[in-house]
Every structure is written in structure tokens, then in C-alpha cells.
Amino acid sequence: MQPPGPQQPPPPPLFTPNNGDFTFVSSADAEDPSGSITTPDVKLNLGGEFIKESSATTFLRQRGYGWLLEVEDDDPEDNKPLLEELDIDLKDIYYKIRCVLMPMPSLGFNRQVVRDNPDFWGPLAVVLFFSMISLYGQFKVVSWIITIWIFGSLTIFLLARVLGGEVAYGQVLGVIGYSLLPLIVIAPVLLVVGSFEVVSTLIKLFGVFWAAYSAASLLVGEEFKTKKPLLIYPIFLLYIYFLSLYTGV
């Protein structure tokens, strides 16, 4: 029986146990590195409602890219209706039309709203409508009537200020424009009775007096005192000229 041979020394370790500040662990003694990372639940409070963020959202916010997730709130000013954007109040325009067509104080309308709260679109619509029924195949009448409305109102405004009236040009422009409504009302009547000269003339005079009274009762206040005829007369002449543009005289 042969004696056992010399035993071979064990192989050197793969890692040195201690190397300065680091400790190396052999692969045989290492723990299984598999596992999972729990993502904290992050909730946003948006308008009283809590919304759970995803891991991608959380990652972007932690890296300073949260601005990519921001959503702009709609500005209520950008969602206004078109009429409101253009400052068009149909109820207000309708009320002013009734005030002009029924100028008698006994009817109970607050007629001063036509002067104290002027608007542009209502008078412009009235003037354009009057221009359309006054065409007679000539589109230049439209621009001419608008020109007379603008500069005629300017003349009345300057005269009112010279006489001591406290009135703005926008107020005069609105009152003169709205007061064209009586001439629009008598237009279809003139088509019917146009062959009767006397009746037609009376209706024309009635329409002019109606329009001039509606405008003068709003523009000529108590501040004019004895100077009222000086302002009523040019208003009356202005509506005579408007009527002449319609009749073609």
C-alpha cells in the first residue's frame, strides 16, 4: 500500500477579501440581486381632484422636466360669444328701437337710455338698412347716406356744444342713426300710396316730424332753455335731406 502523495495547495481566491476601503465578496457568497423597486404614489391636487401620477410622470418631475407636463388653462376671456366680443347687445338695441319708434313719455319707456348709453352697431344697422331700401339701383347711395349720417351728426354735435349742451359725439351719432327708423317705417307705405300725391306728401311730412321729434326730444335737453329752436331746426332739415335721398328728389 503506497503512502498518499503530497496534497496540492488550494487555488488562490478570485477576490481579495480586504483591499483598502472596499470589501469584495465572492460570487459563491453573493446574494441574489433580483428584486423590485417600489414607486411611491404621488398624487396631484388639480381643482380639488386627486390624480395618481404614473412612474414616467414622476421620473420627468424628478429630473426637472415637469414643465413638459403642464397644461395651460383656458382663459375665460377667449371663450366669449362673438356678439359679446363685438360688444353687441341685441336686447339693448331692441329696447332702443322701441324707444325711438314710440317717443311719447306716457308709454313709460326710459328713452334717455338711447342718449346716455350710446352704441355703434345699432345705429349703423339702421343706417345700412335705410341705405339698402334707398338704392334704386345705385350703390353709391349707400356710401352717401353713411357720409351724411356721420358728418350731419358731427354738425349737430358742434352746434349743440356751441349752444352749451353737454353731449358727446357718440351720443349724437347714435340718436341720429336710431331716429331714421320712422323713415324706414313709412317707406313701404309710400310704395302703396305713391300714386296719390297729397296722401304721399302728408305721410312724408309725418315721417320727417316723427324722426325729428324722436331725435330732438333726446338731444335737446333743459340746458338749452330758449335756444331749443336753434338745434331742432337743423335736425329737422337733416331728416328732410335723408328722406330726399330715399325718394330720389
UniProtKB/Swiss-Prot annotation:
Lumenal topological segments: 138, 193-200
Keyword Membrane: yes
Biased composition (Pro residues): 1-15
Subcellular compartments: Golgi apparatus, cis-Golgi network membrane
GO biological process per UniProt: endoplasmic reticulum to Golgi vesicle-mediated transport; vesicle fusion with Golgi apparatus
Key words, A-Z: Golgi apparatus, Membrane, Transmembrane, Transmembrane helix
Keyword Cell division in record: no
Signal peptide, first to last residue: none
Annotated Gene Ontology cellular component terms: endoplasmic reticulum; plasma membrane; trans-Golgi network
Polar residues bias: start-end ranges: 16-26
Matching PANTHER family: GOLGI MEMBRANE PROTEIN YIP1, PROTEIN YIPF4
Its job: Involved in the maintenance of the Golgi structure.
Name of the protein this chain belongs to: Protein YIPF4
Originating organism: Gallus gallus (Chicken)
Gene this chain is encoded by: YIPF4
